[in-house]
Amino acid sequence: MTQLTHGGDWAGYRAQYGHDALDFSANVSPLGLPQGVANAIAAALPHADRYPDPLCRALRAKLAPHEGIPAESILCGNGAADLIFRLAWAAKPRTALVTAPTFAEYAAALESAGCAVRRHFLQAEVDFAVTDSILSSITPEVDMVFLCQPNNPTGQLTPLPLVERILRRCEACGALLVVDECFLDFLPDCDALTAKALLDSKDLLILKAFTKLYGMAGVRLGYCLCANTALLEAMQAAGQPWAVSSLAQAAGLAALDETAYVAQVRALIAQQRPRLTAGLRALGLRVLDGRANYLLFQGPETLGDALRQRGVVLRSCSNYPGLDGSWYRTAVRTGPENDELLKTLAEVLA
């Protein structure tokens, strides 16, 4: 059985080596699942004999004031990836535009729906930043445009004025702009960076997830925001009716109360990202100045395997269009974990 290569394949590592690794390949909160969320999941177990609410009514009602968006403009799914595939199957775009490098599931979902995928290649000379040059790639033949904010794996943020120019270009060409903000909430200034103020346009859909910020990748819970309720209804109908389990819904409801936890995660990332960046550069590695809870850096192509044999796992970016085997993505984790990564890197590079 084959599938797209992603980070966080702890099961594959354990099967190969017989033990767990220090995993920097998955971009989830280094603080783990909040205790309040774990308690909510446990409390929901006695009701697991019931079907979950297919419309996630309670969760959407609580998300509405949290996001400042009407509940009818919110759709929940089995992680953001589920919603990406539902969107492709519901909208059935003929041609779509993605940046390169970026998250692989955009193209995978689009191609599964028979869509032709065009790539706007970002340039290493400007640290793979999205610039105004993307506007000329949005033509009347393009039905959908994906923009990851901050981009995965580069960690680069597209300035909000440029996001708005991209949206206006999409509107002029009849395309839907999909802005993936799944990692944006790791930033303390996320409220000033989100595209939510542009949601009066029915040509904008924003993707969000509980997975990363709340350390609940195994629970699978994401949602999207869009003023085009007809599109959301089509997405709801494009997959199975009970995509979000009752345990995941309980987890989401509890997670929205974890304000102290979120503040702690944001403070940790803000402290550790520049520290890890400096440590990597001190080893002679090229590191991009990203804003996310992960970093993209360049090193020897043998680096990933050498670390893996020592029990440390990075995300090789060799399968990202626009990158090669010399690029790696590392999560920003706790101070002791980051120190262990730097120590092991120093041994390998010596």
Locations of the language-model features?
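N-terminal "arm"/small-domain region of PLP-dependent enzymes with the aminotransferase-like
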Residues: 1-50
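PLP-dependent aminotransferase class I/II
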Residues: 32-34, 55, 203-287
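Short loop-beta-helix segment that forms the pyridoxal 5′-phosphate
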Residues: 52, 64-86
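PLP-dependent aminotransferase-like
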Residues: 89-147
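Active-site pre-lysine segment of PLP-dependent enzymes
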Residues: 111, 129-141, 153-177, 181-213
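Short beta-strands and strand-loop turn motifs
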Residues: 119-121, 144-151, 177-181, 288-289
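PLP-dependent enzyme catalytic core of the Aspartate aminotransferase-like
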Residues: 161, 309-310, 319-350
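Conserved PLP-binding catalytic core of the aspartate aminotransferase-like
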Residues: 269-270, 280-311
